[in-house]
C-alpha cells in the first residue's frame, strides 16, 4: 500500500508539472485531470473518501469550465506542445525547484517514512469524513449559497474583462 501511495504522489507531481508547464490551455486540461485524479486517489488511500469525492467534483466541474473558457477565448492557431524546447525548459525548471526543495528539506529518505493509510489505522478510520456531511448541509447552506453566487459573479466579471472591442464573450446566440 505504501508503494501505491508513493506512486499516486509521483503521478500527482507529474500532473502538477504538466499544469505548471502547460504550453497552451489545450494541454493544461490533461495535466489538471491527471493531477486531480491522482490527488483524489491519494486522499481515498488515506481514508477520506467523501472529501476526495467533493474535491474531485469541484476540480473537474469548476476548473475544467475555466479551462474551456480559456481555450475558447485564447484560441492559438499554432499551439505549443510539450515537446517544444521552451516548454521542456519550464518543466526541467519545475523539477529542479521541487528536487531542491526535497534535498534542502531533508526528505531524501522518503522511503523510510511510513505512510498512514486505511490499512494502518483499521476500518474505523475509513469513514471519519462522513461526520462532516451533516454540517455541510445544515450549518453550511448559507455559506454554500454565498460561495456559489460569488463564483457565478466572478465568471461573468472575467467574461466581461476579456471581451474584445466589437464582440464580447457574452453575446446573443
From Swiss-Prot:
Main location: mitochondrion
Keywords: Electron transport, Membrane, Mitochondrion, Mitochondrion inner membrane, NAD, Respiratory chain, Translocase, Transmembrane, Transmembrane helix, Transport, Ubiquinone
Compartments in which it is found: Mitochondrion inner membrane
Enzyme Commission number(s) of this protein: 7.1.1.2
Segments crossing the lipid bilayer: 1-21, 27-47, 48-68, 87-107, 139-159
Biological process terms in GO annotation: mitochondrial electron transport, NADH to ubiquinone; mitochondrial respiratory chain complex I assembly
The keyword Membrane belongs to this UniProt entry's keyword annotation: yes
Cellular component terms per the entry's GO annotation: mitochondrial inner membrane; mitochondrion; respiratory chain complex I
MF-aspect GO terms: NADH dehydrogenase (ubiquinone) activity
Catalyzed reaction equations: a ubiquinone + NADH + 5 H(+)(in) = a ubiquinol + NAD(+) + 4 H(+)(out)
Membrane topology label: Multi-pass membrane protein
Family according to the record: Belongs to the complex I subunit 6 family.
Oligomeric and partner information: Core subunit of respiratory chain NADH dehydrogenase (Complex I) which is composed of 45 different subunits.
Function: Core subunit of the mitochondrial membrane respiratory chain NADH dehydrogenase (Complex I) which catalyzes electron transfer from NADH through the respiratory chain, using ubiquinone as an electron acceptor. Essential for the catalytic activity and assembly of complex I.
The name this protein goes by in its record: NADH-ubiquinone oxidoreductase chain 6
Protein source organism: Gallus gallus (Chicken)
Gene field: MT-ND6
Amino acid at each position: 500500500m505504501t508503494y501505491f501511495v508513493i506512486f499516486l504522489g509521483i503521478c500527482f507531481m507529474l500532473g502538477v508539472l504538466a499544469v505548471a508547464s502547460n504550453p497552451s490551455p489545450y494541454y493544461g486540461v490533461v495535466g489538471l485531470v491527471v493531477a486531480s485524479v491522482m490527488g483524489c486517489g491519494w486522499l481515498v488511500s488515506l481514508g477520506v473518501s467523501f472529501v476526495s469525492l467533493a474535491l474531485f467534483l469541484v476540480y473537474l466541474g469548476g476548473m475544467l469550465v475555466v479551462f474551456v473558457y480559456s481555450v475558447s477565448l485564447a484560441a492559438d492557431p499554432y499551439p505549443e506542445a510539450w515537446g517544444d524546447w521552451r516548454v521542456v525548459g519550464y518543466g526541467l525548471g519545475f523539477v529542479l525547484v521541487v528536487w531542491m526543495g526535497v534535498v534542502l528539506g531533508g526528505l531524501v529518505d522518503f522511503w523510510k517514512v511510513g505512510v498512514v493509510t486505511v490499512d494502518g489505522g483499521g476500518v474505523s478510520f475509513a469513514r471519519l469524513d462522513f461526520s462532516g456531511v451533516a454540517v455541510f448541509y445544515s450549518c453550511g447552506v448559507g455559506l454554500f449559497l454565498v460561495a456559489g453566487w460569488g463564483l457565478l459573479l466572478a465568471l461573468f466579471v472575467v467574461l466581461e474583462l476579456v471581451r474584445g472591442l466589437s464582440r464580447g464573450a457574452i453575446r446573443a446566440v
